[in-house]
Amino acid sequence: MDYLSTTSSVLHPGSPIAAAGPSAKEDYALDGPTVSIIIPAYKVASFIDETLKSVFAQTFTDYEVLVVNDGSPDTEEFERAINPYLDRIRYLKQENRGASVARNSGLLSARGKFVAFLDADDLWLPTYLEAQMKFIHERGCDLVCADATFFGDTANERRTYMDTLMNDAPAADDVTFLQLVDAERSLITSGVVARRAPIMEVGLFDEALRNAQDLDLWLRLARSGARLSYQRRVLLKYRCRPDGLTGDAVNSHRRELRVFDKIEQSYDLSPQERGKIIEVIRNRRALLEFELGKLHAAQGDEVQSRESFARADHLRRTWKTRVALWLNRVSPNLLKAICSRRV
């Protein structure tokens, strides 16, 4: 790993300890930053300037910023973009090994008691860190995930992540292992602030997983007894782009299925937990087949579309699969038009 710059942001007086409550004082380091912001970067030269501006606009200022270049092919352009910030960030470079390794590099180099993850194309609102830290100390939790609005390459512009993709996510109280398993989508990594110690204790991100390593970590944290909470306040903007870290719905379901398969095969599960995992795997396979059906329909492949929708319907019968199969039969062109809309 190449430390091109190891200069960290200067710690500022006046961190909002009082706003977080008297019990929070022990979490504010005297010899280092309270929060380490970890930003993995791969092919984001055109986005990183805006992202860093959102970081340096934070009302909470007791932080350091670690930017980890994951062997990006646009490194020359990327380094030009971050050059104005080199005296305010710690810049780490590594060979391309994936987001999990990049985030772990940041975690191992971090000096803060808390870590905040941020993808290099997402944006925080100015009060993001202040609100997240206040929530953690008021609730006594180990991890909090805030809500986000979509922007970029999406038809869900200005809608929120949790309302769109996590309707079953609890609005209050701690998130249990089974609730996290049952949610249709994982926490937003760019919306997570957490105590660093529990993450180190459960073994960081699984570097064997090229994708969905964030979901895997949240599940291990919940299973270990760490307290995870949702904050329904919209505190960030979640960029949608086809080649981003998040990817499309088909790949998202495929990635998360690998995590649930890992859980079923390697966790010492209770009968209740095993039953729930089996149910979730079946439902996720249904969601994957439904998204594949939409993809085939958008491409005009009526046969493959019908077969995928039929498999989804067999795994979990819903009104959506019924309507999709009906449209495939009576009006494939209308189905194609509907499925061609970007979600």
PLM-predicted stretches and their roles:
Residues P33-S36, S54, E64, D216:
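Cell-envelope/extracellular polymer assembly enzymes that use nucleotide-activated donors
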Residues V35-F47, T51-L52, Q58-T59, V68:
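A conserved hydrophobic helix/loop-capping motif in glycosyltransferases and polysaccharide synthases
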Residues L52-K93:
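Acidic donor-binding segment of Leloir-type glycosyltransferases
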Residues E77, Q94-A110, A131:
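Glycine-rich, basic loop-to-helix element that forms the pyrophosphate-binding segment
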Residues L108, D168-L257:
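Conserved nucleotide-sugar donor-binding catalytic segment
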Residues V115:
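Short aromatic/hydrophobic "clamp" motif used to bind/position activated sugar donors
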